[in-house]
């Protein structure tokens, strides 16, 4: 056995990412902008825990001992299964049901947080990602669905996307349900096959019509050799479903006429078309019809949607991992889910909502060159020229004086000499450093070096001796002038 202690390998779990300060700043700015829109529409904040009892989440429960199909789960000490939330909607349904008597109805809320999927990771596909949701619970009117769509469009507009950059694509699950009923997929006994069909259609943008056809049939083999089992529908059934996806979208009225023909005499399907017509009238009245379009291919891959479904899609091209141009695609979606709260209350509570994929939006803004960038200015660094306790306390007092004036500052707390400390300040992107050695201390002075100006002048003064003699961008002032001098330097750097 080796006497050396075995080192633990530093490694990140697959499907998870670290986020830098710059990335976090961009996320914070983006979230603040979306929050402004949500609150302008009258929504209030809500936070729920990342863990819920597994039966509360519901959707991914398998017929096996450990409920881990699609979710991360653990068993509590009371032997109850808990799971990390896979979205923010199921926890909202639980919260609304628990607090039904005290909440206003309709209840408008927005939630921000990480969700978790125990799925195969891949490029741009993570097991932990952030969502920003807004929902209205307690009203059946499609005016609520229309308002959610308009709010989604306004959120993208607020982030800097232009009208030609995006579209909110809209359909109604009742129309698809009518088509599924025609091909024999109605009833609870067909629930699993129906869910497989929904997920297959939801891959239309990714795999195209032929890929969806394979997933509706026997299954699809991807480029890596992985096989995804299909819904095993017959060719005639597949053709019936694909006829909905291939409707040519013209004017709104032409699209509605085509949808009525597809659903035939199905009352549920015709009701779905009427709801879309009501929403279209609202969009036209509010001049948003050019940003929100009827698209029969939108289904959303979750079983619990019961009415209008919508998806926010970005329309510009980006390069994929193979260097090919592809449309950026979906950055969020949602719909009506009138049955989700019924699991807790035994009665249908109408609800509708929308979820924005924060990570996808960050990538989109980066592609357009619109990602918020923080000014690359770090804290003022006070160098530690002497490590005697009473001297360290004196340095710390300087730091506190700067902080009290609202100036970010830190005391160098490493063990290196002055040269390494200066390199540290550069790496921290400090605007200036404060230096007080024994000579300055005896005279009650400090040296303040403007690193920004110094870097600029270094390109002009090439001779080392001249540089050392002139000591550019460096001033010596009395200790009591510390704050004012630093303030003047920072102000000059901004000019």
Curated annotation (Swiss-Prot):
It catalyses: tRNA(His) + L-histidine + ATP = L-histidyl-tRNA(His) + AMP + diphosphate + H(+). It is found in: Cytoplasm. Keywords: Aminoacyl-tRNA synthetase, ATP-binding, Cytoplasm, Ligase, Nucleotide-binding, Protein biosynthesis. Belongs to the class-II aminoacyl-tRNA synthetase family. It comes from Bartonella henselae (strain ATCC 49882 / DSM 28221 / CCUG 30454 / Houston 1). GO terms for molecular function: ATP binding; histidine-tRNA ligase activity. The gene is hisS. One of its GO terms (cellular component) is cytoplasm. SUPFAM superfamilies: Class II aaRS ABD-related, Class II aaRS and biotin synthetases. GO terms for biological process: histidyl-tRNA aminoacylation. CDD domains: HisRS-like_core (cd00773), HisRS_anticodon (cd00859). It is an enzyme of class 6 (ligase). Its EC number is 6.1.1.21. Homodimer. Its main location: cytoplasm. This is Histidine--tRNA ligase. InterPro entries: aa-tRNA-synth_II, aa-tRNA-synth_II/BPL/LPL, Anticodon-bd, Anticodon-bd_dom_sf, His-tRNA-ligase, HisRS-like_core, HisRS/HisZ, HisRS_anticodon.
